[in-house]
């Protein structure tokens, strides 16, 4: 670790940002979080973190924060994440996920904060033509959400050519589960995450789960996804930060386990775990959804000598359900 271990995090009161914050604090980093708390939750912020409640485009406030101490790197999580909503309100997603992020990062670069870890998405691949996707495969975003993420990826790539910017872009596959110590997890009134919604049904917070389409070209007709435990994803951020702080070159990495599960397979796994059957019904397809998207994450695994700790669907589901019970 560098002698100066100050790290700036946007969206640290959110699901993934809070998990990363807890882990970095455990490893001795000093964390400052910028979060507007519009979608974030103050209760998820580690008490050891310095929370600054403001918009990332509040130029005066952000500049004040950047001048208060020397930050080694910024981890950018802040943004909107609902694919279906982005199809209805594309301008909103481009504004929040690209325009606002660009304004914020420009302020960072002007203040010599030039190392960035960006929270991107596997949705930039669209409907891949192969079983497991590598980082150099064709990009074909199917939603404004994915478009907005790819736009910021391209902005970072362009900036790295012109100024002294180093980045790591992390393309998340489907993030699920909760902190094993139950310090943080996913809080959302309108979540569309399968495992979150299924856990709400399992804990009687919802009456039923809606499967959005069972006519896809997959073995059981439902979409296939690669689920990664949020604590493993947090560890990926830690390894990426350590890598970036050693002045290594910029990189793009997939974040997944390389194993796909259909929606019905996840439901069956949950039923076996609970020894019951959760209620579900078949609904229409959801705009912007991919059919099958599974990672090849060998690039990250080899670069970082990384091994997942929680690569087990049962464990992901157990922690998700435990978190829902805690929220009750």
Predicted regions and their residues:
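N-terminal Rossmann-like NAD(P)+-binding domain of SDR-like oxidoreductases, especially those catalyzing
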Residues: 1-178
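Short, flexible, glycine-rich and Lys/Arg-enriched loop motifs at helix boundaries
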Residues: 42, 173-194, 204-225
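Short-chain dehydrogenase/reductase
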Residues: 94, 142-150, 184-196, 226-227
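C-terminal substrate-binding subdomain of Rossmann-fold SDR/epimerase-dehydratase oxidoreductases
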Residues: 197-328
């Amino acid at each position: 670790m560098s002698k100066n271990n100050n790290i700036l995090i946007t969206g640290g009161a959110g699901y993934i940002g809070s998990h990363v914050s807890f882990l970095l604090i455990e490893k001795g980093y000093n964390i400052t979080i910028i979060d507007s708390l519009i979608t974030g939750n103050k209760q998820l912020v580690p008490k050891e973190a310095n929370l600054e409640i403001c918009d990332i485009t509040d130029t005066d406030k952000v500049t004040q924060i950047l001048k208060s101490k020397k930050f080694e790197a910024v981890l950018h999580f802040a943004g909107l994440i609902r694919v279906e909503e982005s199809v209805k309100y594309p301008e909103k997603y481009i504004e929040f996920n690209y325009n606002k992020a660009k304004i914020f990062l420009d302020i960072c670069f002007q203040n010599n904060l030039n190392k960035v870890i960006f929270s991107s998405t596997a949705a930039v691949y669209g409907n891949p033509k192969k079983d497991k996707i590598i980082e150099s495969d064709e990009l074909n975003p199917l939603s404004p959400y994915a478009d907005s993420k790819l736009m910021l990826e391209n902005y970072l790539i362009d900036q790295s050519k012109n100024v002294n910017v180093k980045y790591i872009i992390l393309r998340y596959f489907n993030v699920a589960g909760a902190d094993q110590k139950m310090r943080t997890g996913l809080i959302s009134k309108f979540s569309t995450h399968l495992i979150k919604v299924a856990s709400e049904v399992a804990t009687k917070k919802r009456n039923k789960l809606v499967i959005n389409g069972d006519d896809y070209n997959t073995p059981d007709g439902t979409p296939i996804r690669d689920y990664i435990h949020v604590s493993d994803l947090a560890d990926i951020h830690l390894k990426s930060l350590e890598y970036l702080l050693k002045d290594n070159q910029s990189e793009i990495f997939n974040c997944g386990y390389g194993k796909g599960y259909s929606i019905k397979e996840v439901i069956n796994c949950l039923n076996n775990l609970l020894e019951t059957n959760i209620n579900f019904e078949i609904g229409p397809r959801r705009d912007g959804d991919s059919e099958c998207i599974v990672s090849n994450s060998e690039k990250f695994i080899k670069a970082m000598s990384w091994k997942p700790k929680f690569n087990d669907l049962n464990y992901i589901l157990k922690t998700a359900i435990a978190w829902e019970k805690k929220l009750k």
